[in-house]
Amino acid sequence: FQVSNAYLRTRQAVIEKLEEAINFHDFKTRASLGDVYEQLLNDLRGAGNAGEFYTPRAITQFMADRVNPSLARRETVMDPACGTGGFLTAAVDHFRNQLSTKSSAADKAAIETLLRGIEKKPLPHLLCTTNMLLHGIDVPSQIEHKNTLNIGWNDWSANDKVDCVITNPPFGGYEDDGVGSDYPADLRTRETADMFMALIVKKLLKENGRAAVVLPDGFLFGDGIKATLKKLLLRDCKLHTIVRLPKGVFAPYTTIKTNLLFFTKGATVDDGSEHFHTDTIWYYEHPYPPGYKSYSKTKPIRFEEFKPEQDWWGSEANDFADRVESEFAWKVDFKTRREQAEAAAQPHWDRAEQLGNQASTLENRVRDLRDSIKGVSNAQQRRPLEDEIDTLRTQAEGLRLQARDAQAAGDRLYWPIYNLDLKNPNAPEEETHDPDVLLDKYKTLLDQIDETENRLKSELAAALAHHFTTEEADQ
């Protein structure tokens, strides 16, 4: 539409003109504006602005599609690091696709109540709120502006749990000192993505709740706190699928390879044992489209590329019994790996416990002797007691060292099972050659090049000589 400069002098005039030109109450118009808005966010990402906030739409669509939140069952969806709201708008679209001509007004109104997002930074929070408005969420009050990770560990209640979590938590960053200081000691970290994973598993998902999370390769192969988190994930949840994405999906923001982890929160098993809900993990290696060597701004990943994954996916209801291995898909028997590792490590752990108990017995004896020596003033009587204390303390320290060595030996056999950075065993093998053979071939090729060069020089010299001889004869 055309307006004169006079109408553009004040913000209110611009808003009034927009209201005249655009019917914001028309759903189709708002949906179109929502698409335009998301494209603008994509362009900002490609230009290097707000890049940390945007996940490619193909990824948000695919993850929402696979988690499959149900409108009929009124399943709630949360993104605890919602950025500009890409996952939430994908959930909105997924809910709306479940509407039909028979759907009630209550069904349509329910969509707005089933969403929750939390964003730490003001700009992406504003962009997210706008995004939700343009996608037909009239009162996006459920998009909160605060730091999810700064909420006290014990401040999360059962009412905060949701049916579905779909998110791309910031990875590679660290929270300020003090954030997460009340997390359980074995889960305490400042790495942002790790903190989100602890929250999702322990605080956000209901029993049988489903999640899809974007995580880098570093989470899959990481040890230390990451290994502890993966044990928590595999124990408390059923990690059924890892989609491995190629490089460049999130370029230019990052070229780090990323993965989509899909898992379901298991029911609590209170039988005194350490029950693991994950038995089998399926992997799917997403390939580049034919002719692609990477993704870029002009060649982004597309939702249509995930059609093979959708066709292969199957149903969790029958434990994905219809899945088959292929050039891109393979499964890992995690239960067998875990049981074998535990069996190999257990003797070392038992030995560590035995040595620790022996050390504790000696340390208790040392404490008793120290208590008894307090009432002995005679130096001659004290000396043998002090000597015994020194001997027992030395023996206890030696046992503690042996116990630590035994524990470490068991840990070295056990903890590698939590390296989930597993390569595709079904991929075509790359051709390899012996370096010595290649070097010999290279030398032979150089000799052939030299021989050809010398032959050309000889022929050129002969041709020039013939040319000059002919000229002299003509003269």
Predicted feature locations:
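Nucleic-acid modification enzymes, centered on SAM-dependent nucleic-acid methyltransferases
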Residues: Q2, A47-F53
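Residue-level signal for well-ordered alpha-helical scaffold segments within enzymatic catalytic domains
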Residues: K17, D35, Q39, F62-R66, ...
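A conserved structural/catalytic subdomain of Rossmann-like adenosyl-cofactor enzymes
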Residues: W156-Q475
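Non-catalytic, well-ordered alpha-helical scaffold segments
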Residues: Q12, E16, R30-G34, E38, ...
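Conserved S-adenosyl-L-methionine
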Residues: E52-T167, G172-Y174, S181, R190, ...
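Long recognition/docking surfaces used for binding and targeting
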Residues: F1-L44
